[in-house]
Structure formats: structure tokens, C-alpha cells
Design a protein with these regions (language model features):
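Long, highly hydrophobic alpha-helical transmembrane signal-anchor segments
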Residues: 1-17, 75-84, 88, 93-99
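A loop-to-helix transmembrane entry motif
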Residues: 10-13, 34, 38-40, 65-67
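Helical transmembrane-bundle signal
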Residues: 14-25, 69-72, 76-80, 101-112
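Membrane-water interface of transmembrane alpha-helices
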Residues: 23-41, 111-115
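Membrane-targeting and insertion segments and their boundary/processing signals
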Residues: 25-31, 48, 52, 83-90
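A short, exposed loop/beta-hairpin motif centered on an aromatic-Gly-Thr core
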Residues: 42-46
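Membrane interfacial helix-start motif at the N-side
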Residues: 47-66
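Alpha-helical transmembrane segments and their immediate juxtamembrane interface regions
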Residues: 88-126
Length: 126
């Protein structure tokens, strides 16, 4: 029993990435950055192409990252339960959960940049 409680405690580390993504999304939403030169806010090469790119990025990135974090949090919870019931070692479970978290984070940046580029081409009505 004590081993299982320790395993559950270790698996809580899989929630770090989703919680940080939600936190950063909330901070970006509450404190939008209008100055591109400040190097704050959603700051990628695509968002720095022009002031219009920057403004749109600051508008959409918070909502995308909050939504991504919520989905990732739910996914990590289900994954942890499945891996715990399957008796997968904690090391493997942390590796799998961390890998999924990092992949989702990279995907969030990629998706946001695609939305910015589509909007600037006039293909995105949102």
C-alpha cells in the first residue's frame, strides 16, 4: 500500500506541464503585451513579423494555451490511471507523461503560429 501511495505521489509530476501551460495562458490573458520590443508575451518568430502579427498573437495565444492545458490535464489524469492500473513502473510513466506534455506544448506553439499565419493571409475568420 505504501508503495502505491508513493507511486501516486510521483505520478503527480505529470501534471506540472499542464498546470504551467494553464498558468501561463492566464497570465498572458490578464497582462497582454502590446510592445513587441519588450520580449514578453507570446514571442515567436512568426509573432514578431509585424505589429499586426504581434497583436493577433497576443489575442489568440492565451485562449489556445488555456484550452491546451485543460485538455492535457485531463489526458494526463486518464493516462496516469491507466498506467497505474497496468502496473507500469513509475519511471516509465513519468517518461511517457513528460514526453506527451512536451509534445503537446510544442504542438501548441506550432498550432498558434499556424493560426497567426492563416489569419494574416485572410484564411481564418476567428
Amino acid at each position: 500500500m505504501a508503495g502505491m501511495i508513493g507511486s501516486i505521489g510521483m505520478l503527480l509530476q505529470n501534471f506540472i506541464v499542464p498546470l504551467v501551460v494553464i498558468l501561463v495562458g492566464n497570465m498572458l490573458r490578464k497582462h497582454p503585451v502590446s510592445d513587441m520590443r519588450s520580449h514578453n508575451g507570446y514571442n515567436t518568430p512568426v509573432s514578431r513579423r509585424s505589429q499586426a502579427h504581434w497583436d493577433y498573437a497576443q489575442k489568440i495565444a492565451p485562449e489556445i494555451f488555456i484550452r491546451l492545458g485543460k485538455y492535457l490535464l485531463a489526458g494526463e489524469a486518464v493516462l496516469n490511471v491507466v498506467l497505474l492500473l497496468a502496473r507500469v513502473s513509475v519511471g516509465w510513466a513519468l517518461g511517457i507523461g513528460g514526453g506527451i506534455g512536451i509534445a503537446a506544448l510544442i504542438g501548441g506553439f506550432y498550432y498558434t503560429d499556424l493560426k497567426i499565419m492563416a489569419y494574416m493571409r485572410g484564411e481564418d475568420a476567428s
